[in-house]
Each structure stands twice: as C-alpha cells, then as structure tokens.
C-alpha cells in the first residue's frame, strides 16, 4: 500500500516584481548540441544569475531553457504595517494544497488587491528600475561574452558555416502578489511562488516574440519605475489576456542587439573611432537615474531610436487606440520604414504587429472597439 505524503507547509502572501526569461530556439539547439547542451545552458545561466543578483534580484527557478526571477518587495503584513493600512491585520496563511483554501486565497487576494499601492513603498521605484537594468545588462552580455559569442561559429549550429547562430532570449516583467511557500512532497520540495501575476510575467515573455522585441513589461511594472525609467520605455499596445477582462498596457525598452559592445577592459583609443559612447560602466550602487543616463550598456542598446521614429510610432499608436486606423496606418508604416534604415533591423516589430492586426480587420476598427485587444498568443 502506498501512502501519499504531501507537504503541509503554509504559504504567505507577498508582493514582488516577477521576471521570466527564455532561451529562443532551444529545442533545435538541444537536438544539435546533444550532451553539450548542459554547457550551453549553464553558460547562459551564469550570465542571467550574475546580473539578476547584482541588480538586487533572485533567481528562483531554473527550468531548462527558462528562468523565473524575483525582485522581492515584501510580505503583505510588513507592507500593510509600513503603509499604515492595517497594522493589526495578521498575515494571511494559506494551507496547501487544499482546494477550498485555494478558493479562499483567491477571494482574499481579490479583496485585498486594492489595499496595497506598491507605488507608495519606499525604494520600489529604484527596485523596478534595477529589474529592467538587469535585463538590459543580460542582453548586452549575451552579445559580448566570448564564451557565448563562440556559439556563433559553432558548425553544429551554423550548418557548417552557412549562417551565423546568435543566442537570443525573451524577457517579461510584471508586478503583483503571489503566495510564497513550499510545493511538493516529502520526497521533493521546492520553494516557489504561485499567482496569476507570475503567469503574467511568463505570458509577457512569450508575447515578446509576437511584437519582435526582446523585452515586454506590463503597466503594473511600468507604474513602479522612476520617471526617468518610464521615459526610456516605449508603450506598444493595450491588451487583455486569457482569463482577465482588465485592459493592461505593455511596454518595451528598445534594445538593438546586433552590434559590437565594449567591455570594461576595452582599450579606449581603439574603440573611440567606432563607438562614440563613453565607456562608463555603472554598478547597482549607482543611482538608477544616472545608470539610464550615463551607463554605456544602457545607452548603447537604444542608440538607434530617433525622435522622428518615436514621434511616428507614438502618433500611430494613439490613433490606433482611438480607433482611427486608416490614419494610424500611415504613421506606423513611417515608423517601420525609419527603423528599417537601421543596420541589421528589418523594420519595427511592434509597428508591424499593429499593422498586421489592423490589416486583418480591413483597416477599420470594429464597432465594439474600446481601445484594447485580446492578446491572441500565450
């Protein structure tokens, strides 16, 4: 007779910034590298873990080709006391894995969601900035690390030199609550986070492919950033996701990966003629506003974005959201043409995504249009 023993640890409701990132084309790489896939994954994991840790985050789970990342804001009770909302309220304990308790937890979550305004938490704006900066640093390192660049010439991945292979990842960021606790049995227990907000981070990562950008962040996350951080992000769309009727804005930090990035050990005289950006590399000890303004990596990633492009896209996006699709088309097509002038860019992914959506509807907003659309891919 087999006796089923499950973990009876309780979970605690907490708030955090949740990140999810994924290695693109992993199945194909796995098949071609065979036993060397472990070295490939661990080389990338070292980059992800290093920059997430440096920029005040934690790597919670390694899922083969994907990573769940957490920038912890605080448990519910601590935040309620900090913000003076309910100083006498006990921390909510949720017994696992009882279905009735799960339903109760969901009801409590919905009721309490409006009680904690994360924007009021001291230091949360800098923490949000650091989560985005960590992602940008990872993207740069994937295109700077000699160990990772070596895969570009690996004959197993390039069809014996027929083309160049590039390591690419997708990244999602979202903020909200989760139940923090142990999941498993006496044989295997994992510390993890369970919540629709964790799922949303994964959904954003997956959708980054649809928009042709490496990074997608939600309105929930965007609202936590400093004004400087917000000014560096581009709003792409307003969407709803499966299981929710609440519209949410999505944003990106424009990142041009196909370029040469200096390292901290670069010789200034050799690089100055080909790269006008001063080699200033700032750490997490620096003010995040200064990092956005002066850090070499952050500036290099978005140096291809021009005021003319931003004006064309933003105008087109606003017209699209207002339902004037015929006029929006011209502005978004112009934005796409401007981005296509950038070396190694085949136009602007977000512009192309919106244009395809409007084209599928005959360039006429449906009569039921309310300024948002369902996200069709998970």
Regions found by a protein language model. Name each.
Residues 1-14, 50, 92-111, 122, ...:
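Regulatory cytosolic signal-relay segments
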Residues 15-28, 74:
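Catalytic-site or vestigial catalytic-site microsegments of nucleotide-handling domains
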Residues 20-21, 55-130, 140-196, 220-231, ...:
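Catalytic core of nucleotidyl cyclases, primarily class III adenylyl/guanylyl cyclases
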Residues 27-49, 60-61:
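Conserved long alpha-helical elements within nucleotide-processing catalytic cores of c-di-GMP signaling
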Residues 93-108, 163, 168-169, 177-180, ...:
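Intrinsically disordered, glycine/charged-rich C-terminal tails and inter-domain linkers
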